[in-house]
């Protein structure tokens, strides 16, 4: 066994745990879990343990991650992610994804948004492999353990790079809400181009957001908060909501308290900086 890297030992607890979860994931990832298949004949699934899914805190969005992505939104097979909303008689989805959590981390926001917006399909996008696996296993367990009430059928996660391939997944004006919760601050000046909010990326976000759709941002890094606010305020298709709106918005309350990063900041008595922006209609062409 290599003590420096227990993942190389095929008999280590972490490797055995991941192997077991991977087999379970292959079996249940795209299965329509309902009362007829209730919890694998009554068997409950344990929620995944985060310590077995260790990965670096951040990932380089410009690297070649060998990701699978559709060539266009029309080629995206949503039935695999949301089988409960697939109509086999028509061969079509009964709903479209309308809420996206970009860089969803360990899925805390997805889990809390699910019961708050039961009529919406909610997708998390995460670039890190093991973190994505953790969220997949978490959703599988929640769907299975709550199959009788059809809970958590409206959320799922994909491994994807939103900075490169977002328009490959979503049609124009498809989304009503986009969340950017505690993104990588990329402190060094030369890495600012890798931040998730830039002028170029905001135009892509505006493309997939419908009129009056909302971009939600939260961070514990004031410099990053100021950066995101500056770029959003400078973009002609976004307008900031005032503090009163933020204080009364249900999503802001969930966003402040649901994510793992948010809970960590809370434990450390840190600050959380929130900014929300409305997607303006395209200007009329005279």
Swiss-Prot record:
Reactions mediated catalytically: guanosine(46) in tRNA + S-adenosyl-L-methionine = N(7)-methylguanosine(46) in tRNA + S-adenosyl-L-homocysteine
GO cellular component: nucleus; tRNA (m7G46) methyltransferase complex
GO MF, one example: tRNA (guanine(46)-N7)-methyltransferase activity
Gene3D superfamilies: Vaccinia Virus protein VP39
Annotated metabolic or biological route of this protein: tRNA modification; N(7)-methylguanine-tRNA biosynthesis
Annotated S-adenosyl-L-methionine binding sites: 103, 126-127, 161-162, 181, 259-261
Assigned keywords, A-Z: Methyltransferase, Nucleus, RNA-binding, S-adenosyl-L-methionine, Transferase, tRNA processing, tRNA-binding
Main localization, broad class: nucleus
Family matches, as InterPro entries: SAM-dependent_MTases_sf (IPR029063), Trm8_euk (IPR025763), tRNA_(Gua-N-7)_MeTrfase_Trmb (IPR003358)
Subunit (UniProt): Forms a complex with TRM82.
The name this protein goes by in its record: tRNA (guanine-N(7)-)-methyltransferase
Gene that this polypeptide is encoded by: TRM8
């Amino acid at each position: 066994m290599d003590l420096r890297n227990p993942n190389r030992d095929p008999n280590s607890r972490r490797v055995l745990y991941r192997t077991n979860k991977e087999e379970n994931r292959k079996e249940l990832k795209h299965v329509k879990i309902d009362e007829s298949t209730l919890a694998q004949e009554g068997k409950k699934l344990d929620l995944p343990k985060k310590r077995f899914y260790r990965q670096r805190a951040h990932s380089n969005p410009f690297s070649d991650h060998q990701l699978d992505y559709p060539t266009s939104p029309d080629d995206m097979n949503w039935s695999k992610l949301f089988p409960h909303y697939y109509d086999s008689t028509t061969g079509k989805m009964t709903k479209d994804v309308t809420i996206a959590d970009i860089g969803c981390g360990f899925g805390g926001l997805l889990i809390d948004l699910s019961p708050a917006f039961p009529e919406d399909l909610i997708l998390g996008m995460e670039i890190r492999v093991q973190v994505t696996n953790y969220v997949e296993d978490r959703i599988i367990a929640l769907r299975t353990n709550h199959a009788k009430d059809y809970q958590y059928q409206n959320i799922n996660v994909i491994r994807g790079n939103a900075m490169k391939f977002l328009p490959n997944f979503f049609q124009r004006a498809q989304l009503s809400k986009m969340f950017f919760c505690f993104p990588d601050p990329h402190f060094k000046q030369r890495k600012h181009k890798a931040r998730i909010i830039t002028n170029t990326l905001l135009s892509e976000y505006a493309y997939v957001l419908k009129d009056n759709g909302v971009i939600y941002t939260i961070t514990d890094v004031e410099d990053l908060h100021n950066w995101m606010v500056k770029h959003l305020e400078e973009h002609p298709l976004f307008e900031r909501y005032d503090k009163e709106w933020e204080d009364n918005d249900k999503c802001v309350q969930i966003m402040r308290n649901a994510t793992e990063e948010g809970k960590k900041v809370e434990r450390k008595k840190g600050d959380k900086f929130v900014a929300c922006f409305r997607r303006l209609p395209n200007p009329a062409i005279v």
